[in-house]
């Protein structure tokens, strides 16, 4: 019996060594500059009676966005910049299950905070005719004037309470659906002063992560070892009982 466990221990050590040596599969994807089929655009509140003013220009290597929120405090105001992977509604979503970091390389003026958002397709909630029904994941990001190179841990993007309330969705249904990312968005921070211009110039947005395939192989081997260990222990017990 001791010999069996010694052999299993040796095998386990070998498995761990193999796992350490397995090459980690890096996942990387660029949001901007734009990939095939993607589109960048700006939005404001004018269609809903707001007075926010937006200036927007897009080139291959730089997106320039400027906004001043409407000064009427009695009205809600909003503006932002959207990078859309599926502008034609063909469900060409991006699988970011292996993403662990979202990178921003941006120039900032006129604000000390931006909201960074991803919108994901949720088959139980999303109506393709209504973009706001995609699942929202949000991160408030502090910024400074000038160039900002920011790495955001992807797990820090959260589903805000107002999304659940607006959509009438139970909070227990909190799966982020990272496997179907439809859009990335940058918008004004919550405390942006009304009427004050703020500028976001986007040099690059990208994501990266490590595939967990090697970890899955490792667990599968460990499971196999456990089965072998259990199988080898049973004949010994039966032999002891017969004696």
Question: PLM ranges: what are they?
Answer:
Residues 2-243:
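Beta-rich carbohydrate-recognition modules and glycan-binding surfaces
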């Amino acid at each position: 019996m001791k010999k069996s466990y010694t052999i299993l221990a040796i095998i386990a050590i070998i498995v761990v060594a193999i796992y350490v040596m397995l090459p980690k599969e890096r996942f990387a994807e660029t949001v901007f500059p734009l990939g095939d089929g993607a589109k960048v655009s700006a939005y404001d509140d004018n269609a809903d009676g707001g007075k926010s003013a937006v200036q927007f220009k897009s080139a291959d290597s730089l997106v320039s966005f400027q906004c001043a929120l409407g000064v009427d405090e009695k009205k809600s105001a909003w503006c932002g910049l959207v990078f859309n992977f599926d502008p034609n509604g063909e469900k060409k979503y991006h699988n970011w299950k292996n993403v662990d970091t979202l990178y921003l390389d941006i120039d900032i003026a006129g604000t000390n905070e931006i909201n960074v958002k991803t919108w994901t397709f949720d088959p139980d909630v999303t109506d393709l005719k209504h973009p706001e029904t995609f699942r929202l994941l949000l991160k408030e990001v502090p910024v400074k004037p000038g160039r900002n190179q920011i790495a955001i841990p992807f797990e820090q993007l959260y589903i805000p309470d107002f999304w659940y309330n607006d959509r009438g969705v139970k909070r227990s249904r909190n799966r982020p659906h990272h496997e179907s990312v439809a859009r990335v968005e940058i918008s004004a921070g919550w405390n942006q002063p009304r009427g004050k211009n703020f500028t976001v110039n986007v040099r690059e947005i990208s994501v990266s992560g490590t595939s967990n395939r090697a970890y899955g192989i490792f667990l599968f081997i460990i499971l196999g070892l456990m089965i072998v260990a259990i199988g080898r222990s049973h004949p010994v017990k039966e032999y002891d009982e017969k004696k």
